């Protein structure tokens, strides 16, 4: 299913919490800014508005997310920050989200910071996977399924059924993928190399065999996802990040309703 891109600010990636050891990985940094108390309060309020658990004390705030925790400690003209998660991908996600939030709501902050501890930047997104097309199946006149092969897909074989496909420009043989800046922020390719991020559902996955299947609603060239699926040939490359959650809560029964873009998720829920 093709949707508008949703920035990875507050993603409920509960799958990240279940695939690594119980010992959290910790990373710390210091951001230089005046008004650090106001900045910490603004960040904490942002997370609270997105239904995260926020605990305030005399020293700052602790924020609990499905992917880990975030601690804010304001000082004199600086804000000390700690992020903790059970995976390198979780640490990277929280760094990128926090820097993006600070950039948005505290524009005066000096974000030329460096992290110490887990996940020190090597420029790579730990949850990024490059995939290639190995199969094309038309399910109907308006739905096409692509089988995409890649390495290390066990990370995606969990409760989180959604992910983000990074669709390269048409005709680009060697796509440029996003990287991580030293401050943890995601650097996206720009101009003629810009990729189009879109959220999709992993319809099926066989991590051992090394493939996933994704269903695309076909509407010609109107949209990067549909255009990619329409022109897909074996060997074509596409990127993936995530997973993005989508697991069902505990309940006695469910009522599913949606348009054709929701069919892949509904189908997977019914099968599983």
Regions found by a protein language model. Give the residues of each.
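Short Lys/Arg-enriched alpha/beta "domain-start" segment
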Residues: 2-55
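Short, conserved charged micro-motifs
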Residues: 36-42, 88-95, 153-158
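A common structural junction motif
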Residues: 48-53, 99-107, 167-168
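Short, intrinsically disordered low-complexity segments
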Residues: 53-88
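Short coil-to-beta-strand transition motifs
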Residues: 121-130, 190-198
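Ferredoxin-reductase
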Residues: 136-227
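FNR/FR-type flavoprotein reductase catalytic core
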Residues: 224-272
């Amino acid at each position: 299913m093709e949707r508008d891109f949703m920035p990875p600010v507050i993603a409920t990636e509960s799958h990240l919490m279940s695939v690594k050891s119980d010992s959290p990985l910790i990373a710390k940094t210091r951001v230089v800014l005046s008004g650090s108390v106001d900045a910490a309060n603004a960040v904490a309020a942002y997370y609270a508005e997105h239904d995260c658990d926020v605990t305030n004390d005399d020293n700052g705030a602790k924020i609990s997310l499905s992917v880990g925790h975030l601690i804010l400690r304001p000082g004199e003209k600086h804000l000390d920050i700690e992020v903790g998660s059970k995976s390198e991908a979780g640490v990277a996600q929280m760094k990128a989200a926090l820097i993006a939030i600070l950039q948005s709501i505290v524009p005066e902050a000096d974000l030329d910071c460096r992290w110490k501890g887990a996940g020190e930047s090597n420029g790579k997104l730990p949850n990024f996977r490059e995939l290639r097309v190995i199969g094309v199946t038309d399910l109907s006149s308006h739905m096409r399924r692509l089988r995409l092969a890649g390495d290390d897909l066990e990370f995606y074989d969990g409760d989180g059924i959604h992910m983000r496909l990074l669709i390269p420009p048409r005709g680009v043989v060697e796509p440029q993928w996003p990287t991580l800046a030293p401050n943890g922020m995601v650097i996206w390719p720009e101009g003629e190399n810009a990729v189009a991020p879109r959220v999709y559902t992993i319809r099926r996955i066989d991590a051992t065999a090394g493939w996933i299947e994704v269903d695309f609603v076909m509407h010609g060239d109107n949209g990067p996802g549909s255009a990619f699926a329409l022109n897909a040939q074996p060997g074509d490359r596409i990127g993936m990040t995530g997973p993005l959650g989508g697991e069902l809560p505990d309940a006695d029964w469910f009522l599913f309703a949606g348009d054709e873009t929701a069919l892949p998720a509904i189908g997977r829920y019914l099968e599983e």
